[in-house]
Amino acid sequence: PGLAKTMGAEELVCVDLEGVGITRPNRTGLPTTLIRSYWELGDILHFDPATARRNIELGYHDTLRAFGRLRGCAYAVDSGAGSSADAAAFHAAFEAVQKEVREKHPSTLTADIALLLAKLSDAELAPLEAVAEDVGVDPAPYYTTRSLGEAFLAKCDFERLSRFGPLFEGEAGPAQAARAALL
């Protein structure tokens, strides 16, 4: 039946390290919370203090997320009212831009499709998390929606972003729209 159940455990908290080996199914029947990291944690057999520190921070955030204390999928984002209101406002503005781009250039790969492919589960934060990951925002800190947006802007390549201008100014043809979306 499993050691934990035999010793009287009433619930399990399991951490998936995505390590090499055999993963046995949980047949205990106990309520189980599974903690997984979105991020690559590195070689667990090679001890490096900086990597260990980073993994401890990420693991702490993953645990808080698993128990509903944080939002986000890739980034640890505050779940309080202010940060959640900012996430909802960001999502509404993002959706309006998405709609405008789809209407002008229907063949453009839109972010809603890309986000499905990225498997980011928090719909309001997914666009912000995806771009933050794309530019290399550090996943270890604790963020609010606003501070994650600011971290994204600090790492942003504004030259790359300027290529998207024609999508919003109505000057781009379908080929230029597709090129901008892929860059």
Residue ranges of each PLM-predicted region?
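Patatin-like phospholipase
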Residues: 1-183
